[in-house]
A protein has these predicted regions:
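Short, surface-exposed "cap/lid" segments of acyl-processing enzymes
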Residues: 1-27
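Hydrophobic/aromatic beta-strand patches that form the interior of the parallel beta-sheet core
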Residues: 15, 39, 59-63, 142-144, ...
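Conserved acidic catalytic loop of the alpha/beta-hydrolase fold
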Residues: 23-37
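Gly/Ala-rich beta-loop-alpha elbow adjacent to hydrolase catalytic centers
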Residues: 41-50
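Flexible "cap/lid" loop of the alpha/beta hydrolase fold
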Residues: 55-87, 117-126
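Conserved alpha/beta-hydrolase catalytic His-Asp/Glu region
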Residues: 89-129
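Short beta-strand/loop motif that positions the catalytic acidic residue
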Residues: 137, 143-145, 149
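Catalytic histidine-centered segment of alpha/beta-hydrolase-like enzymes
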Residues: 151, 168-183
Length: 194
């Protein structure tokens, strides 16, 4: 989010992770120190990756991600099973369908997609319930879900008490970067970081 980076670059170091679906994975090391806090912003599967791979953090802003949404309900598990089966036959078809349901235009990347990593990630979504990890960390967390999300439907979410529900779909932070930045800045202000 370039807009956000312009707002906070003088106070925060911004580090970007890439899970490697369309290019080489990039997981920079995060150093924990007394004088630096680690706040994370995730989207979709990035939330699951974070819960599995980052031991602690000082704050988390999560757009459209869930630790257990995909593993708990049988109809959703069946849908992921279909995606896995179809992905083996025609990855572009599945990705095009996913992006369409996310409200984002799919553009086949110039480089080769990492099909194995994409399939492995679908298995993680289907098979792993990460809620035990999710609640170990008592750091402030803001979950943002979207009213028109066709990937993670609001009606199927279990816990919405402290979560923020906004207008938009699964592609919200990409399609509305200014609104996403406002949510992030507000979270940082509420937690005395700005």
């Amino acid at each position: 989010l370039k807009i956000l980076n312009n707002e906070i670059c003088d106070r925060f170091e911004t580090i970007t992770f890439d899970l490697g679906f369309y290019c080489n994975p990039y997981y920079p090391s995060i150093t924990e120190s007394q004088d630096k806090k680690n706040f994370f912003i995730t989207h979709s599967f990035g939330y699951n990756w974070l819960l599995k791979n980052i031991n602690s953090f000082d704050g988390l802003i999560n757009f459209c991600g869930s630790a257990s949404y995909f593993s708990k309900k049988s109809n959703i598990r069946k849908s992921i099973n279909r995606m896995i089966k179809m992905f083996k036959l025609d990855p572009s078809y599945v990705l095009n369908d996913f992006f369409k349901n996310s409200g984002v235009q799919f553009e086949k990347p110039n480089k080769l997609m990492n099909n194995k990593l994409l399939i492995d990630s679908l298995h993680v979504l289907r098979d792993e319930n990460l809620t035990t990890i999710e609640y170990k960390n008592k750091a402030p967390q803001q979950n943002i879900f979207c009213k028109d999300d066709r990937i993670m439907k609001i009606k199927d979410l279990e816990k919405l008490d402290g979560d923020l529900v906004v207008d938009g779909d699964h592609g919200f932070p990409y399609k509305f970067p200014r609104k996403a930045s406002e949510i992030i800045l507000n979270f940082l202000k509420q937690n005395n970081e700005l």
